[in-house]
Amino acid sequence: MKNPTPILLAIGVLTFTNCDTLKQTAGQMATDAINQQMGGGNTTSKPILSKDEAIKGLKEALLVGVNKGTDRLGAVGAFAKNPSYKIPLPPDVQAVEQKIRDNRILNKLIGGELDKVVDAMNTGAENSMKKAVPIFKKAVTEMSFQDAMGILTGGEGAATDYLRKTTESDLQGAFKPEVKKAMDGVSLTKIWNPVVTQINKNKRILGLDNDIQTDLNQYVTEKATTALFQEVEKEENNIRKDPVTRTTEILKKAFNYADQQRK
C-alpha cells in the first residue's frame, strides 16, 4: 500500500485553505451588509448616506420645524384665533366658570377678568415663542446613529416623537422661565391672583371642595410646548411627503435615502 501521508496532508491543506476562504467570505459578506445598511456598496463606491449625514439630516429637519413652528405660533392671534391651540381656562376654573357667570355678583366681580386671563395666557404663549428656538436647538444636539437611522426610515412624526420623549421634560424646564417673562409682560399674574382669591373665597357657593391652586405658568408652558411639538411634526411630515420642501442638500440626501428604503 502506498504511503497515505502526502494525500492526507494535501487534503488538510485544502481543508484549512477552504476554511480560511469561508471565513474571509463570511467576513466580507458581513462588511457588505453593514455597508449596505449604511447606504453604501463595496469599498470603492461612495456610501449613499453616512452616519454624520443621517444625523445632520434629521437635526436639520427638526430645526426647520422649530423655526417655522415658532414663526407661525409667534404671530399675533396664533393661539387665540386657532381652535387647535387656543389656551382655555385651567380645568379647575373651567369647572366653575358657568356658575361664576350665572351668579350676578361674582360675574360682575370676575366675569370679565376670566376673559382677560384667557387673552393674557394666549398672548403670553405667542410672545414666548421667540425664546424657544435656542432651547430646542440645544435639545437636538445628542442623537445616536442607531436612533437616527431608525427615525429617518420610520413613519410620520418619528423624529418629533423621539424629540418629545427624550427632551420634553427638560425643554419645559428651560422654557418655563421664558413663558413666565412673557406672562409678566402681559400682567397675567395681576389679573389671575384676584380671580383665584374670589373663587376660593366663594368656593362653597361654587361647590368647590378645595381651593384653586393651579400653577398657571406651568399650565401655559405645557400648552405652548405641546403646540410647538405639533407644529414641528407638521413640518417633519411635509419634508417626508413632499420632496419640494427639502430645501437643502443634506435634507435631500437624507430623506431621499429614506424614500428608497421604504420602497
Please report, for each region that a protein language model flagged, where it lies by residue.
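Bacterial N-terminal signal peptides that target proteins for export
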Residues: M1-I7
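Bacterial N-terminal signal peptides
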Residues: L8-T15
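N-terminal Sec signal peptide cleavage junction
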Residues: C19-D20
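A cross-kingdom marker for long, charged
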Residues: Q24-A33, Q37, N217, E222-K263
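N-terminal Sec/ER secretory leader and immediately downstream segment
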Residues: Q28-A120
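Extracytoplasmic
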Residues: G57, N82-S84, Q146, K223, ...
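Mid-length scaffold segments of soluble, non-membrane domains
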Residues: N107-A182
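An amphipathic alpha-helical core segment
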Residues: E178-K223
